[in-house]
């Protein structure tokens, strides 16, 4: 995975968590605070979901209890694309750890898809990869990944 892709994944996880709170909150003050927190230069200095939760605790139980419930409900799955080595696979586990440590959010690393020229060829030919090469290495990756998702299994650390 490219560094830019990793950064984008962290940004997506953060913003989708904030959107979840805004969407389900019935408290205008909470929605406004979350909206403001999405700006890195907000007046409260909130930069992460963990910092948002700490700030909400200072404001009282109504908003912080709701946000804590949303934190427990929010459980995104992570899939790595274009993996080239075992070190790339370790990035998935590192991202799980970093999300919990810095964001206070649990993320499940479900698997990966290896880098493979068959994908590009499939896109250029506008034919589904699984129709062209279901038994290829990438086809097996996709089948394994689908099984992990359906069975809600995480990738064990190597």
Kindly give the residue locations of the regions a language model identified.
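NTP-binding/hydrolysis catalytic cores, primarily Walker-type P-loop NTPases
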Residues: 106, 120, 124-158
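Short, surface-exposed, charged/polar-biased interaction segments
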Residues: 30-37, 99-100, 116, 130-134, ...
């Amino acid at each position: 995975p490219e560094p830019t892709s990793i950064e984008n994944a962290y940004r997506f996880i953060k913003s989708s968590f904030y959107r979840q709170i805004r969407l389900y909150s019935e408290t205008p003050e909470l929605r406004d605070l979350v909206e403001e927190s999405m700006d890195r230069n907000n007046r409260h200095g909130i930069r992460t979901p963990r910092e948002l939760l700490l700030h909400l605790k200072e404001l009282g139980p109504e908003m912080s209890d709701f946000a804590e419930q949303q934190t427990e409900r929010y459980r995104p799955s992570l899939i790595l694309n274009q993996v080239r080595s075992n070190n790339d696979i370790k990035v998935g586990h590192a991202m799980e750890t970093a999300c919990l440590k810095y964001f206070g959010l649990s993320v499940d690393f479900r698997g990966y898809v290896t880098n493979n020229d068959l994908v590009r060829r499939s896109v250029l030919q506008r034919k589904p990869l699984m129709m062209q090469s279901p038994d290829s290495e990438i086809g097996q990756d996709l089948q394994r990944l689908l099984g992990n998702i359906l069975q809600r299994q995480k990738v064990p650390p190597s």
